[in-house]
């Protein structure tokens, strides 16, 4: 692109596949650009941290019988190298749906519907917790309640949520109450 892009102009990219972001930015060789992106990510990988309370939250939910899964816009390779391996959280999740597992990514409902099908869960017995408008739209289109994880995201415009979680510790309390 050879141009500076303001951080605020890139908010749209949070929660959609990298290839979709690159095409939106006018980049045609998305394979090369994605490769470069992943190379740069490796340089800063050690700075990436989980939000406080996430391991405790996942342990608490699993211990209380909740079936946990992930629906992500990351590729399976990105999920493995950026999340599963560095944070050692894979044991908490029964099913992981990555971008290449369905034909249409979030905000379409297919990834979440695929998760529900693979996990043998009805939409009315599920809650999808996410932090982007694309997560909200995906849940709404799939007929699943949506919990907005607002602790790390200032971009709430347009997000429709059944639950608002201001910090990870709010999640179990909210689920038990309902």
Which ranges hold each PLM region?
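N-terminal helical cap/lid subdomain that shapes the substrate entry/recognition surface
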Residues: 1-59, 64
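Asp-based, Mg2+/Mn2+-dependent phosphohydrolase catalytic module
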Residues: 8, 59-62, 75-76, 81-178
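Structural motif
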Residues: 13, 71-73, 129
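Transmembrane alpha-helical core positions of polytopic small-molecule transporters
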Residues: 44-48, 73, 105
